[in-house]
Amino acid sequence: FGGGVLMIHFSHVTKTYEESWKALRDVTLRIRKGEFVFLTGHSGAGKSTLLKMIYMDERPDNVRGGQVMVRLGDSVYDSKTSPDNSIQGFRRKMGVVFQDFKLLPDRNVFENVAFALRIVGKKPKEINAAVFEALALVGISQKRFAMPYTLSGGEQQRVAIARAMVHNPYLLIADEPTGNLDPKNAEEVFAIFKEINARGTTVVMATHNPDFYLNSPFRRLELKQGELLNKEIL
C-alpha cells in the first residue's frame, strides 16, 4: 500500500457471472485516503459489482492474479487471503448507502440509526451521542421519532446516510444514492456527501447524474461494459 495513503487497490480484477457474462473486465484502479471519487457508466456497466468488491460482497475471479485490497485504519482486507468470517468486523469500518434506502419499516428514525450500534453492544450514552451527531450531520434531528413511512424520499435517504455514518467510518460507499430523488433533494443529498468528505471520510459514489460530476473537481472513474475507460488518471 505504501505510505498508508492508498486505501483501495484493484489489480487486474475480473468478475464473471453465469453464462460467461463478465461484469468487470481486467479492472485496475487506486483510490487514496480522503478522496471523493465518482463511479460512472450506463446501467449494466459494472458499477454495482465494483462497489460490491469494495465492501466484500463479491470476490474477483481467480484469473491474472485478480485482487482487491482495502485498508481501513490498521485493518487490511485482501480478497485473496481474508477469510469470510473476518469480513463482518471489517465492514463496520465503512458505511454503505443504497438507492432504495433499506430502512427498517417498524422502527423510528432514531432506532434505524442506532440499530448497528446496539448490535455491537455500545452503551446507551454512547449510542445517544453518536445518533444525535449523525442526525445533525444530515439535518434531520427534528424527525428522530418519525416512522419511515411518514418521510419523503429525500428524508429517508438522509436517515440512510446517518445510519451509514453513525460509527464514523473511514470509507463511505454510495450506490446511486440520488437515483430515486427529485433534483432538489438530489442536490441536497450530494451536498451532504461533500460535507462528509470535507470532514475526512473517503467517499466513492456511483452515479449516472452528470450534473454532479461534469463541473466537479473530484476524480471520475468511468466503466463501460465492465472495462475502466479512463485508466490514464489513476
Spans of features found by a protein language model:
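Helix-to-loop junction immediately C-terminal to a conserved catalytic motif
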Residues: 55
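A short, proline-enriched helix->beta-strand linker immediately N-terminal to the Walker B motif
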Residues: 166-170
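Catalytic Walker B motif of ABC-type/P-loop ATPase nucleotide-binding domains
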Residues: 172-175
